[in-house]
Amino acid sequence: MKGQEETLLGKSVGQLTDWVKQQGQPAYRGKQLHQWLYQKGVRSLTEISVFPKAWREELKDYPIGRSNIVHCTIAPDQTRKYLLSLGDGLIIETVGIPTSKRLTVCVSSQVGCPMNCDFCATGKGGYTRNLTCAEIVDQVLTVQEDFQRRVSHVVFMGMGEPLLNLKEVIKAVKILNQDVGIGQRSLTISTVGVPKKILELAHHQLQVTFAVSLHAANQTLREQLIPSAKSYPLPKLLADCRKYVEITGRRVTFEYILLGGVNDLPEQGIQLAKCLTGFQSHVNLIPYNPIEEADYQRPDGESINRFKSILEEHKIAVSVRYSRGLEANAACGQLRAMSAAKN
């Protein structure tokens, strides 16, 4: 990417083999380098003990592409929110979400976000640039290193709109799958919807989970919540989602943040059900996490259950996802650079 320093992280085993050969080393060093980068997670080439000492010394300042943790907050449920400093000093956020059987990483795809969703803390902080493939992969390796256990799942639900950085996101998906060793079906790409990009993603024929942040079943309300929806009318968005299912053979997950008194009314549940009838899909209802910058409220339990029941009555597959890491300001929609607020 323009202006970004080339790093070893983000390269495939073939590319790494080409690189070591350019350095005058035998081809087998490429596989060694690949293993130490992606399986051992080294932060400096001097750590690669199988390399000749003299060569390691030559490479001591060569950029791998690893970030530094500048802050980590741990919630009572052991969710960890990280502020990571990139090579150019910009700060991004990453979240590690552990359970007894899983370790999920919520990765950022951009520094900030240009979509400016009305209820989201990240969008209030503006947008700076796209992340590189290496900067995305690094987030997973950093969380894996900090937890001292393998990452099992990755969700592209952190800072940024993944489909606005699709080239680097696709590269990161392939590296995470083929090089880090995470199954594609354990990777989730989420979007609020970007014209033409859903079908572009579909034609890559990935086996990832695809999630669309819907949040409203009528265009007027959706534009209020998601300003970018003005350029992507709901009927066209849903039509593209249906084409995605046809092309990939995989269902679409619809994320629906429940905002008390705004989009959680019974008639809105019926409206959503009608939009999705006959659709190969699943709905994730997410009770809102209040932020200082937006005047929305979390719905009560009765409203949540009522909305879920309406969808179930219409034979819509639905579940309620309660966000982890609330105490760490790390839950869905609350990702923002705390350092920016201090400056």
From Swiss-Prot:
Residues 99-327 form the Radical SAM core domain. [4Fe-4S] cluster binds at residues 113, 117, 120. The gene is rlmN. Its EC number is 2.1.1.192. It is found in: Cytoplasm. The active site is at 93 (proton acceptor), 332 (s-methylcysteine intermediate). Belongs to the radical SAM superfamily. RlmN family. Binds 1 [4Fe-4S] cluster. The cluster is coordinated with 3 cysteines and an exchangeable S-adenosyl-L-methionine. It comes from Crocosphaera subtropica (strain ATCC 51142 / BH68) (Cyanothece sp. (strain ATCC 51142)). GO terms for cellular component: cytoplasm. Reaction proceeds by a ping-pong mechanism involving intermediate methylation of a conserved cysteine residue. Its cofactor is [4Fe-4S] cluster. S-adenosyl-L-methionine binds at residues 160-161, 190, 213-215, 289. It catalyses: adenosine(2503) in 23S rRNA + 2 reduced [2Fe-2S]-[ferredoxin] + 2 S-adenosyl-L-methionine = 2-methyladenosine(2503) in 23S rRNA + 5'-deoxyadenosine + L-methionine + 2 oxidized [2Fe-2S]-[ferredoxin] + S-adenosyl-L-homocysteine; adenosine(37) in tRNA + 2 reduced [2Fe-2S]-[ferredoxin] + 2 S-adenosyl-L-methionine = 2-methyladenosine(37) in tRNA + 5'-deoxyadenosine + L-methionine + 2 oxidized [2Fe-2S]-[ferredoxin] + S-adenosyl-L-homocysteine. GO terms for molecular function: 4 iron, 4 sulfur cluster binding; metal ion binding; rRNA (adenine(2503)-C2-)-methyltransferase activity; rRNA binding; tRNA (adenine(37)-C2)-methyltransferase activity; tRNA binding. It holds the Pfam family RlmN_N. This is Probable dual-specificity RNA methyltransferase RlmN. The keyword Methyltransferase applies.
